[in-house]
């Protein structure tokens, strides 16, 4: 019988339970266990926000926090995390400076210690929310607080597919500048919290920018758009080991099964 081609024969001494197992070479190796030195960054998109439903550009002026539905969405995620314990023991909790992200982080915080009251059986408390402007949605400049119809009337149309270097409005960011800013912020967080679990409450654009900046297949595409639909209160998880970013999950909106 002809064996598998070189590089794919991963068992030495097949049939002998005491034989050593030879791992596949680096080029085809898959890693499921978290390396001891790895950093994990869990990015949570905020729940539905007032600016999402009112059609307002939601920077510092335009953001009015979460809607009641948005709070319920985040509470659903929190309840799932309490049920699974998957973020218990996370080391730090960040949010952008925008109210919708801060509210999201505050609602999720109890799941980091596994208790709705925000304190663990051992007396520990959920980490305080650390705000970081580098995690904000694209800075809108003079567009902040305008409705999108007002934006179009004042600034005209915007085509980032054609010109990703064009600022959204005077004083605002371009798409390329935004992606680069997010990439730098994530690198800084991963370096500061090496070997830790970092939870980040942020925005759909920030998550899209992370994919553009950190996925090898998207390398060099800072001016591109991925046409994603990142759901409210969803999780996107990265693992960083020796500066290599590995995507573990995107748009995770799973909720606990109902109790019957």
Question: What name fits each language-model region?
Answer:
Residues 2-28, 35-39, 45-122:
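Active-site-proximal alpha-helix that buttresses catalytic centers in soluble enzyme cores
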Residues 2-40, 138-149, 196, 212-260:
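Acidic, low-complexity terminal tails and accessory targeting/binding regions
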Residues 41, 91, 189, 196-205:
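Generic beta-sheet signal
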Residues 51, 111-184, 239, 249-251:
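Phosphate-handling substructures
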Residues 95-96, 180, 201-202:
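Short beta-strand scaffold positions
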Residues 204-208, 241:
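GST superfamily/GST-like fold recognition
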